[in-house]
C-alpha cells in the first residue's frame, strides 16, 4: 500500500507506509503521480509555535499571486497574501550618509487577504476546538486540501473540507472550495466570507533576514460589498502602486443562501446562512481576483478584477483545478525527479522543485525573490542566488521561467547603469545586490553593494540559459547587452598588478561568504569574473560572426571595440587565482589565511552567528558563513581533484553553514571528489532546509535558492551534470544514499531522462532531434529510437594526493617512520591516559591541549601537563608517568593487525619493494611490543630504543641514531611524522620530512599527505 508522505509529530518528512515492492527498477521510476512522495501531508493541527512554519510549507502561488497556507474558518488564521509586483517603498535613514549609499528600500507587503471564511453556529458560538486534522499539498495537481473536525463548546462536531488552488498562469486568482459537513450537529450555520486588509508584516527586530522595511502594510482606500461580491482598493503607504481585490461566490450544494453583506474600511464581504443535520453538507466556492498597476485608476482596477473573478467563477473550482493539474503535468513530464529507494528524500526533492516552479515570476518584470512569494522574509528582495541557483535549474526544467528572470535583469539594466554611476564607475552596469524594482535597496554596503560578484552571477545565468536553450533571439536582443555592460565593471575595480607578476587583481569587494567583507582578490569573485570576461569575449565573437548586421550595430551602440575586448581577454588570462604554497589551498582572499581561526568552543553553539556576533568580530577570524572557494569549484571549470580535495577539507573546517545555500555547494563538491557520505549528509541538509526549518526562519517564507540547490545537489552532484559547455556533460555515480535515481532535463528542445541504477546509466531521449552528450568523457549520440545504456562510473576515490612544498633530494635510500598517528591510532589511547592524569591533578585538558603532547616523550609530556595544574602536585613525577603508562597499556592491550591504519601495511611493503631500508622512530617505550602486536615488526630493519636517548623529539637525536643504524646519511632519508615536534626533529636532522595529517598543523613539513594510504613512494623516490 502506498500512502502520502507526511509530516510526523516530530516534524520530519516520512512515508506513512513503505513503498510497495516493484518487480523492476523501471516500475519504481514510473510510479504514478498519486504515489506517496507526491503529497506533503500533516495530521496535527498547527499551534502558535508552528502556525507560521506550516503556512509557509503549504503556500500556493503561480508566480504572480502567493497565498500562505492558513485556516480559512479560524479568526486570524487564513494567512498572508502577496503579489509579486506589489511593494512599498520607504526611505533609508543614516546617521552618516555618504555618496552612493542606497536611498530607499522596497518592501513586498501583504495585500488583501481573500481566504477568510469565519464560521459560527446557531448560538453564535465559534466552531470550538480541533479534534482531528489533516492537511495535504498535492505536488502533482498543484492544489491543497485541509480536513478539520471541530467540536463546539456544546459538544457538536462539524467537519470542514477546504480545498485551494492558485490555478491560472499569469493571473492573480485564488480559488477555494469550502465544504461544511455535520457529524452530529443540527442547526443553523453562518459563514462570514470576507476580504480583510492584509496584516502588517513581521517587524525586523534583531533579525536582519527580515529587512528594515518589514512591518510595513498597504493602506486601504475603499471597500464595498453587494450580495455575493465584494471589492477592496489599496495603495502603498509610500509607493504609487494600487491594487483591487474582488471576491465572488458560487453556492454549490446544501441549504445555504445569501443573508446579507457588510462593508467596513478594513473588512467587507458576504454573510451566508445555512442549516445542517447529521450527514448533511453545505458547499460553496469562492473566487478571489486581484488587479494592480502603478498609478492605476481605482475604478478600472476594480472592473478588471471583477471580470477576472466572474469569468473563472463560471468555470467552477473543479474545472479550474483540473486544468491547473494538466498544466503542471506538462512540467513534471519535463522535469520529474525520482529517488525510489529513499522516499523521504524523493518527496523533499519534488517538494522543493514544485515550490521553485510555482514561486518563479512569469512576466519578466519581477525577479525571483529569496523567499519567493511565500512570505515576507528578506522584504521580498531578489538577490544573486536567483541567478546562481534558481536559473541553472529552471533553464533545463522550465526555460521560460529562467528567461523571465533574465528579462527582469535586462529590463532593469538602465537602473543598474545608474547604480554604477552612483558607485563612481564611468561605464557599464552594476547589478544591485538586493532589489525589487531594480534599484539598490541594501543599507549595509559591506555586505551589499560590495558584492560585485553579482555581475558575474548574472552573466553565469545567461551563459547557462544560452547553452541549454540556444535562444539566440534572447542573446541578441537582451542577453548580449546584459553580459557586456556588466563585464565593463571588472576593469574599473581591478588592475594588472606588477607586484604580483602582472596578475589581474580585484580589490575592495565582498564575496558570497558574508562573514568576510571588503577584501582583495576574493577567490569566488575572481574566478567568476574570469568566466564572465571570457564569456563576454565569446559573445562579441558570436555577434560579429553570426549576426553580421545586428552584431556590429549593437557593439557600436554600446561602444565596445577591439581594444576593450582584448583587455578583457588579457584580464581573464591573468586573473589572480593563487594557491597557498604552505597549505596547498586556494586562499579565500588575500588575508583570510592570515587571520586567527574562529574559536568554536568559546563561541558556543548559538546559530546563526549573525544574530549573536558583531560583524567586525566575524571579519577578523577564519570563519565562513558559506565557503566562497567551495562554491566557485561547483560553478566553474574543473581543476585537479587533489586541489579540490584540499580546498574542501580546509574550508569544511571553518564553515558554519549559516547560509541556507552552503550545504548545496558542499554536497556537489563532495560528490565530485568522491566523498559520497558527506555528499549525502549535505544533500539532506539542503533538501530539508524548509521542511525541517533547519535555519529557524522558514516562518517568514521558503528558501528558493536552497530549494533549487537540493535539485543541483542530486543532479550536479550525483548526476555529474554540467551545462556550461555546448555539449551537456554527465558523470552519474551511485551510493548507498541514492542507489537509484532519475532526473529529466530539457536541452535545446529535447527532453532527456537520465536513470541510474545497478544496471548502469540509461539515457532516454523522450522527444526532439538527436542529441550528443558527454558521458564521463565518452561521446554518445542519443535518439528517440531506443534508450542508450552506459556504464555507471565509480565514485572517485578521495584525491588527497601529496602536497609537496619542497622537492626531495636524490637518492632516497631509507625511510624513518613514526608509529603513533602514522601506522596506527594510539593517539586516542594516549589522550585518554593523559586525561586521566590531568583529572587527577586538576589540570584543564582537552583534545586541543593534547596536540602539544603529540610526538613528545612521556616525561616531557608530563612536564607540559604539570604546567597546566593549578597548584603544586604532591605525587612524584615518575609515579605519575608510570600511572599514565599503565592506563595506556590497558587501553592498547587488545591491539592487533586490524588496528593498523588502512593502507599502512601496504605502504611498508611497497617501501621494501622499492629498496628502502626502514627504521621505526617512535618516542613510545612501548613501540616494539606494539608493532609486534600489529604484525609489522618484521618489516623494519631497525627500531630505535627511546630509553637510550638523551633527548626526545623535537631534538634530532632519534633520527640521527636511526640513519646511523641503517648506514645511510640523513640527507638520503625520508621521514614520516604526524606531529609538529616530529617534523621539526626531521628537519633539524636534515631528513626530508613528510607530514601525515593536516597541512595547516604540519606547516613546516616538506610535503604532506592526509593519511598513509595516500602515500605514493614513487612521488618521492624519483625515476
Where is each model-derived feature located?
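Asp-based, Mg2+/Mn2+-dependent phosphohydrolase catalytic module
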Residues: 805-813, 909, 925-1023
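Active-site neighborhood of HAD-like aspartate-dependent phosphohydrolases
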Residues: 808-851
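Acidic/polar, glycine-enriched structural segments that form the non-catalytic walls/loops
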Residues: 3-378, 613-614, 797-802
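Active-site core of glycosidic bond-cleaving carbohydrate-active enzymes
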Residues: 382-410, 477, 534, 538-541, ...
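C-terminal capping/lid segments that line or modulate ligand- or cofactor-binding pockets
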Residues: 52-83, 389, 437-438, 515-543, ...
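Non-catalytic C-terminal accessory modules of carbohydrate-active enzymes
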Residues: 103-153, 159, 641-645, 652, ...
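Helix-terminus loop motifs that line ligand-binding clefts
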Residues: 360-374, 400-460, 466, 473-477, ...
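Short, acidic loop-to-helix structural element flanking the phosphoryl-transfer center
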Residues: 890-920
Amino acid at each position: 500500500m502506498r500512502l502520502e508522505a507526511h509530516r510526523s509529530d516530530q516534524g520530519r518528512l516520512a512515508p506513512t507506509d513503505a513503498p510497495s515492492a516493484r518487480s523492476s527498477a523501471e516500475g519504481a521510476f514510473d510510479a504514478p503521480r498519486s504515489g506517496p512522495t507526491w503529497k506533503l501531508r500533516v495530521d496535527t493541527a498547527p499551534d502558535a509555535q508552528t502556525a507560521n512554519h506550516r503556512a509557509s510549507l503549504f503556500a500556493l502561488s503561480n508566480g504572480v499571486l502567493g497565498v500562505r497556507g492558513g485556516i480559512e474558518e479560524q479568526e486570524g488564521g487564513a494567512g498572508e497574501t502577496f503579489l509579486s509586483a506589489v511593494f512599498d517603498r520607504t526611505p533609508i535613514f543614516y546617521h552618516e550618509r555618504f555618496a552612493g549609499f542606497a536611498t530607499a528600500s522596497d518592501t513586498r507587503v501583504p495585500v488583501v487577504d481573500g481566504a477568510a471564511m469565519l464560521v459560527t453556529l446557531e448560538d453564535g458560538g465559534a466552531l470550538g476546538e480541533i479534534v482531528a486534522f489533516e492537511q495535504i499539498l498535492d505536488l502533482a495537481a498543484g492544489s491543497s486540501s485541509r480536513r478539520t473536525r471541530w467540536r463546539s463548546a456544546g459538544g457538536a462536531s462539524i467537519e470542514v473540507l477546504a480545498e485551494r488552488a492558485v490555478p491560472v498562469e499569469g493571473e492573480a486568482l485564488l480559488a477555494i472550495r469550502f465544504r461544511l459537513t455535520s457529524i452530529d450537529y443540527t442547526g443553523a450555520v453562518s459563514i462570514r466570507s470576507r476580504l480583510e486588509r492584509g496584516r502588517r508584516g513581521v517587524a525586523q527586530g534583531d533579525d536582519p533576514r527580515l529587512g528594515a522595511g518589514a512591518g510595513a502594510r498597504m493602506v486601504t482606500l475603499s471597500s464595498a460589498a453587494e450580495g455575493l461580491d465584494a471589492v477592496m482598493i489599496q495603495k502603498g503607504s509610500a509607493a504609487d502602486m494600487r491594487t483591487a481585490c474582488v471576491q465572488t461566490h458560487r453556492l454549490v450544494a446544501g441549504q445555504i443562501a445569501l443573508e446579507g453583506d457588510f462593508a467596513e474600511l478594513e473588512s467587507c464581504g458576504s454573510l451566508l446562512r445555512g442549516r445542517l443535520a447529521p450527514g448533511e453538507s453545505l458547499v460553496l466556492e469562492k473566487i478571489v481576483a486581484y488587479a494592480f498597476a502603478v498609478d492605476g485608476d481605482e475604478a478600472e482596477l476594480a472592473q478588471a478584477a471583477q471580470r477576472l473573478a466572474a469569468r473563472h467563477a463560471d468555470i467552477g473550482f473543479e474545472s479550474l483545478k483540473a486544468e491547473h493539474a494538466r498544466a503542471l503535468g506538462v512540467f513534471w513530464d519535463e522535469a520529474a525527479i525520482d529517488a525510489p529507494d529513499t522516499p523521504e528524500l524523493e518527496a523533499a526533492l519534488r517538494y522543493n522543485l514544485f515550490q521553485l516552479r510555482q514561486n518563479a515570476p512569469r512576466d519578466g518584470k519581477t525577479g525571483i525573490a529569496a523567499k519567493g512569494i511565500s512570505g515576507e522574509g528578506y522584504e521580498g528582495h531578489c538577490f544573486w542566488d536567483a541567478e546562481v541557483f534558481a536559473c541553472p535549474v529552471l533553464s533545463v526544467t522550465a526555460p521560460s521561467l529562467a528567461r523571465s528572470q533574465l528579462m527582469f535583469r535586462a529590463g532593469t539594466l538602465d537602473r543598474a547603469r545608474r547604480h554604477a554611476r552612483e558607485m563612481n564607475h564611468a561605464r557599464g552596469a552594476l547589478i544591485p545586490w538586493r532589489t525589487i524594482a531594480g534599484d539598490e535597496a541594501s543599507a549595509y554596503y559591506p555586505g551589499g553593494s560590495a558584492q560585485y560578484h553579482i555581475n558575474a552571477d548574472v552573466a553565469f545565468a545567461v551563459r547557462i540559459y544560452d547553452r541549454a536553450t540556444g535562444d539566440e533571439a534572447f542573446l541578441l536582443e537582451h542577453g548580449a547587452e546584459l553580459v557586456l555592460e556588466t563585464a565593463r565593471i571588472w576593469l574599473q575595480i581591478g588592475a594588472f598588478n606588477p607586484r604580483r607578476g602582472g596578475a589581474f587583481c580585484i580589490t575592495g569587494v565582498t564575496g558570497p561568504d558574508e562573514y568576510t567583507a571588503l577584501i582583495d582578490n576574493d577567490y569566488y569573485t575572481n574566478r567568476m569574473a574570469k568566466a564572465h570576461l571570457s564569456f563576454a569575449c565569446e559573445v562579441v565573437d558570436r555577434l560579429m560572426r553570426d549576426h553580421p548586421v545586428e552584431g556590429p550595430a549593437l557593439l557600436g551602440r554600446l561602444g565596445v571595440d577591439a581594444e576593450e575586448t582584448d583587455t578583457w581577454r588579457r584580464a581573464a588570462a591573468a586573473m589572480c587565482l593563487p594557491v597557498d604554497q604552505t597549505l596547498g589551498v586556494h586562499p579565500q582572499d588575500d588575508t583570510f589565511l592570515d587571520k586567527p581561526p574562529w574559536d568554536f568552543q568559546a563561541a558556543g553553539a548559538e546559530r546563526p552567528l549573525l544574530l549573536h556576533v558583531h560583524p567586525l568580530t566575524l571579519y577578523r577570524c577564519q570563519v565562513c558563513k558559506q565557503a566562497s572557494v567551495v562554491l566557485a569549484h561547483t560553478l566553474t571549470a574543473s581543476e585537479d581533484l587533489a586541489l579540490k580535495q584540499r580546498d574542501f577539507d580546509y574550508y569544511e573546517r571553518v564553515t558554519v553553514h549559516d547560509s541556507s545555500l552552503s550545504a548545496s555547494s558542499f554536497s556537489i563538491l563532495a560528490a565530485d571528489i568522491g566523498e559520497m557520505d558527506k555528499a549525502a549528509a549535505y544533500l539532506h541538509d539542503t533538501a530539508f532546509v524548509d521542511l525541517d526549518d533547519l535555519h529557524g526562519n522558514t516562518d517568514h517564507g521558503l528558501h528558493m535558492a536552497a530549494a533549487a540547490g537540493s535539485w543541483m545537489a542530486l543532479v550536479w552532484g550525483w548526476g555529474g551534470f554540467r551545462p556550461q559547455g555546448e555539449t551537456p556533460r554527465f558523470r552519474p555515480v551511485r551510493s548507498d544514499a541514492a542507489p537509484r535515481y532519475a532526473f529529466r532535463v530539457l536541452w535545446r528542445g529535447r527532453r532527456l531522462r537520465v536513470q541510474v541504477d545497478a544496471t548502469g546509466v540509461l539515457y532516454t531521449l523522450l522527444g526532439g532531434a538527436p542529441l550528443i552528450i558527454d558521458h564521463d568523457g565518452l561521446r554518445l549520440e542519443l535518439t528517440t529510437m531506443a534508450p542508450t545504456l552506459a556504464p555507471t562510473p565509480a565514485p572517485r576515490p578521495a584525491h588527497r594526493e601529496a602536497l609537496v612544498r619542497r622537492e626531495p633530494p636524490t637518492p632516497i635510500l631509507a625511510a624513518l617512520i613514526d608509529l603513533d598517528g602514522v601506522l596506527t591510532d594510539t593517539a586516542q589511547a594516549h589522550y585518554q591516559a593523559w586525561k586521566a592524569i590531568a583529572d587527577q591533578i586538576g589540570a584543564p585538558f582537552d583534545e586541543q591541549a593534547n596536540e602539544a603532547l603529540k610526538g613528545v616523550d612521556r616525561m616531557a609530556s608530563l612536564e607540559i601537563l604539570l604546567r597546566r595544574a593549578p597548584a603544586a602536585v604532591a605525587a612524584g613525577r615518575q609515579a605519575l608517568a608510570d600511572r599514565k603508562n599503565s592506563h595506556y597499556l590497558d587501553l592498547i592491550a587488545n591491539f592487533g593487525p586490524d588496528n593498523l591504519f588502512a593502507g599502512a601495511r601496504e605502504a611498508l611493503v611497497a617501501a621494501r619493494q622499492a629498496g628502502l631500508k626502514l627504521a621505526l622512530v617512535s618516542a613510545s617505550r612501548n613501540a616494539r611490543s606494539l608493532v609486534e602486536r600489529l604484525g609489522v615488526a618484521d618489516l623494519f630493519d631497525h627500531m630505535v630504543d627511546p630509553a637510550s636517548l638523551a633527548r626526545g623529539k623535537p631534538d634530532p637525536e632519534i633520527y640521527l641514531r636511526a640513519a646511523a643504524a641503517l648506514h645511510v646519511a640523513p640527507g638520503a632519508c625520508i621521514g614520516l611524522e604526524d606531529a609538529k615536534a616530529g617534523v621539526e626533529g626531521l628537519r633539524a636532522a636534515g631528513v626530508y620530512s613528510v607530514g601525515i595529517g593536516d597541512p595547516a598543523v604540519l606547516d613546516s613539513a616538506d610535503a604532506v599527505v592526509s593519511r598513509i594510504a595516500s602515500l605514493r613512494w614513487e612521488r618521492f623516490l624519483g625515476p
